[in-house]
Amino acid sequence: FDEDRFPVLTGRCTECGFCVRCCPGGDVDFPVLSQQLFAATYDPADLQGYTENLFISHPVDQAVRFAGASGGLVTGLLLYLLAKGEIEGAIVVRMDPEKPYQSQAVLATTVAEIRDAAQSKYCLTPSMEVLQELRTRKGKFAVVALPC
């Protein structure tokens, strides 16, 4: 990646077009997607999309709840899983301490690191490097991510 976090061609591109087939950067055809995945008709007026159930929740810890963007549920869940020994850590996104205008994916293994990553980040955040780190680690890890 360059300094602006855009991919740099390294001379290994074979021009096969696989990357464009995986993520063409175009629109999602929601009517077709709804029919294929849910056998349901897509209604653009329904802002929720296809749902079976909706739940509302937040952590009991008020500090975690109000430090989050929308109630702190993900942060609270990660802290619970870490405390219970269900995970050894989580790949989360935080703001880069050296470049506070950029986000970065990190492997958080402590309460402080998980709390530091609270709130949603709507930024392009490369995560393959930190995902590769999991290859050398043993244990269970959570991944917090938003789809593209």
Regions found by a protein language model. Give the residues of each.
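Iron-sulfur-associated redox domains of electron-transfer enzymes in respiratory
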Residues: 30-147
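Cysteine-centered iron-sulfur cluster-binding motifs in ferredoxin-type domains/subunits
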Residues: 1, 6-26, 68-72, 148
